[in-house]
Amino acid sequence: MLLQIAEPGQSAVPHQHKLAVGIDLGTTNSLVASVRSGEAKTLPDMKGNVILPSVVQYQEDKICVGMNAYQSAAMDPQNTIISVKRLMGRSLKDIQARYPELPYQFSESENGLPVIQTAQGEVNPIQVSSEILKSLSRRAQDTLGGELEGVVITVPAYFDDAQRAGTKDAATLAGLNVLRLLNEPTAAAIAYGLDSGQEGVIAVYDLGGGTFDISILRLSKGVFEVLATGGDSALGGDDFDHVLAQWIKEQAGITSPLSSQEQRELLTLATQTKVALSDSDNVKISFKDWSGEISVELFNSLIQPLIKKTLMACRRALKDADITSEEVMEVVMVGGSTRTPFVRTSVGDYFGQTPLTSIDPDQVVAIGAAIQADILVGNKPDSEMLLLDVIPLSLGIETMGGLVEKIIPRNTTIPVAKAQEFTTFKDGQTGMMVHVVQGEREMVEDGRSLARFSLKGIPPMAAGAAHIRVTYQVDADGLLSVTAMEKSTGVQSHIQVKPSYGLSDNEVANMLKDSMTYAKEDMKARALAEQQVEADRVIEGLVVALNNDGDALLSKEEQAEILQAIEALITLRQGTDAQAIEDGIKKADEASQEFAARRMDASIRAALAGQSIDEV
């Protein structure tokens, strides 16, 4: 008889290779990769294609995903969903404002999320994304010959909580076990870092079909640290197609609106022309009754404003990282749109070096995700690689006066947990509203509200006596949990922040820009609000003290002097001069100094009443 012997807690077959994959869930195309025989490779379909167009067509009796769906887009635009990643985590109003030309019939669900009317009924962006993930999962399981233990799915670094949560929901709907969501530029760094063993600062320029990300990373002794991120969640190669399509419309003299089918045909023509211009100086094109020619120089001039926007984001990211372009050792190009020669030369000129393109820019993200999945599933327990992502915008809490107290600053590495203690403002206060905000500005009204929740059951105490510990925790996927706990009783309240929809495009960049533009004004506004809050505290404290002990401890003249100081402070409090309010607070403190001393003496006498010196 043969017995299988294993260490306690270990598998009886500890060297069995667990099946895990990395998925690049892209706006235009998606890929799946896995580590096989020690090497990460993308997995092809039965026809040998590694790229799966991120297109889903809903027919009455079936759902098509990929190339078949893509080829049907022009004939059946309303039932063929392309670039669904652009819709993830957005409100219907935001989608209609940003993409008015989309051929879909939208409506709004009961919870305010957008749904698309198709031949199979209503579908939402999460369901559409899940169909793409199902297709990639089937491909992986057929190729690898078994059930998947887990997946790592990549997302743009600029995806907010709602967009990340939507991606995880899509994976769950597809029956996948998500090991981790991974920022796309970070996945590329893993692929290049492990392949070439570089150490130092690198810039990852990721221009896909629908998103742009720039990440400044430091690679050192196996540690991938993201120093800063930037980008635009709605800028990519699709926009190249749109500006070229608009040019063709103008050249053809088309002024009346196009049908859905004609619009799709025009965009398909624009895409084909863009690709052809990567290898040719001139391309002949025709649309409807018009024929013409476009040169690569003209095409470059059309897309130059879009490329300039990406380079401005690069400049901001370098500034955030406190790095100069000269300190960047390598520039990694990621995303199919970086195949455009003018993109490569523009980025090369900006950074003063030839960008790295040795790994297929379409496949590099999936390859990096596969390497990470292989580690997380336990196939490389001895791996020393450490991965540190960052949050793109500061997370804070509203305090008295509409001020923002930042708990976790932007560009903090995640996962992270930070706590801060707060107290009550009024005597006998038994509840507290916790307002979670996002952004770089000093005042709540200038930031983005994420969530509100209440902490109830605080024991009645004097103002400032209660201790409420508020903990912000961001997990590896960038999702935020907030807990508030009153320390003496242990009573607590908790919320996981999952906004109903995400930031509109350019909003993150604008929030960062505004924080610099209005820095001086914000600090003045904060200083004023802080003095107003302090004035309120002093006024309320003195009024309560006078009501309780004024007659017993003060003469009428002394009471009148303090009341005069209070009234003067109330008047100053209503103004906008922070220094004047601060001076008024000092005068009120000086006027009440003797009163405070007498109250302290009276309290001590009351506490010691009836006790002997020995007992004291």
Swiss-Prot record:
The keyword Magnesium does not apply. GO terms for molecular function: ATP binding; ATP hydrolysis activity; ATP-dependent protein folding chaperone; unfolded protein binding. The keyword ATP-binding applies. It holds the Pfam family HSP70. One of its GO terms (biological process) is iron-sulfur cluster assembly. Keywords: ATP-binding, Chaperone, Nucleotide-binding. InterPro entries: ATPase_NBD, Heat_shock_70_CS, HscA_NBD, HSP70_C_sf, HSP70_peptide-bd_sf, Hsp_70_fam, ISC_FeS_clus_asmbl_HscA. Belongs to the heat shock protein 70 family. Chaperone involved in the maturation of iron-sulfur cluster-containing proteins. Has a low intrinsic ATPase activity which is markedly stimulated by HscB. This is Chaperone protein HscA homolog. It comes from Aliivibrio fischeri (strain ATCC 700601 / ES114) (Vibrio fischeri). The lineage of its organism: Bacteria, Pseudomonadati, Pseudomonadota, Gammaproteobacteria, Vibrionales.
